[in-house]
Amino acid sequence: MTSTAYKLQAEGIHKSYGSNHVLKGVTLTAKAGDVISLIGSSGSGKSTLLRCINLLEKPQQGRIVVAGEELQLKPGRNGELEPVNPKQLQMMRTKLAMVFQHFNLWAHKTVLQNIIEAPVHVLGISKDEAVERARKYLKLVGLEN
C-alpha cells in the first residue's frame, strides 16, 4: 500500500525521559475512517505516543506523515525533534482528532468556551470562526442551548 493510502503514518517513534525509554521505535498507520484504540497498562506510553504524533511532546526519533504530507522535523535541543515550519505543524494538527483518556474541562467556563479553547489557542483559528463552528456542531448534537 502506498503512503498516500494512509491518512496517518507515525514510523519509528522514540521517546525517552532520561534513561527511561518509553517509546522504542513505535509505528502506527491509519487509513481514512479508521478508529484506533491504544490499550495498555498505566505508564505504557499510550498518551506519550499520541502527544508525540501531534508534537505536544517531542520525540527523539521518528517520522510523521499526515494525509500524504511528511512533517518536516529537525534535531532540536536535548536531542528532541522540532518542526522546521510551525505553520506546517499547525495545519497538520487541524487534520488530526485525538481523544485522551483524561481530558480537562474548565468548570468556570461555559460549554462553548471549553469547546473553542483548542481551536483558538492550539490551531490558531479566530475566535469568531471557532464560535461559529462550535455552534454548528452543538446544534448537530442537540446542544445548541
Language-model-detected regions and their locations in the chain:
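The feature captures the beta-strand-to-loop junction immediately N-terminal to the Walker
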Residues: 39-41
